[in-house]
Amino acid sequence: LSAFEGDERQIEKILETYTPNQAKVFNHFLFDGEEHELFLCKPASGMTSLFKPKKEALDFFNGFSKLGEVQSVEKIKTIRLDDVPKLRDFDFLKMDVQGAELSILKNGENRLKNCLGVQLEVSYFSLYENQPTFGDVDVYMRSIGYVPHQFLDVKRWSIAPTIFNGNFRTAGNQLLESDIIYIKNPL
């Protein structure tokens, strides 16, 4: 297993889950190989991203304004997936990178040639400025020879100010994001 995590605050979680014999952790921000701003949110929020949180989108969902609060902004250097040294070929790729999936895929086409399956977190509603949505990712994945295999998780959220059972985390009907697996098109 190869894991990529540029946010040093999150590396410890990976190492708690996998031993060094099970996983090699690359301390890189995958993207397009250029310098970018990193919008750091609270570690537990899972919303740190290379894309700036979009206030009006966060306000649309209960509780997201707090989750998407940017604590600081840092300049960081990214690396293309195709350019990662000492990375062996892989047959499965899993990504949850807060909107950066499409750029990473586009900058990793050579690495994807032998990859049989890809698991991505895709958004139906852009929570970040210029964040590609599910439609953008799906069109691209099909263009490089992958087809949807299955949805693992479909996350719904309640629209503000609606709260169910007194808990803002209780799901509503608004589609938010999903984990989807793509496989190489067998036809």
Each model region followed by its residue ranges:
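Phosphate/nucleotide-binding beta-alpha loop and adjacent structural elements of enzyme active sites
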Residues: 1-187
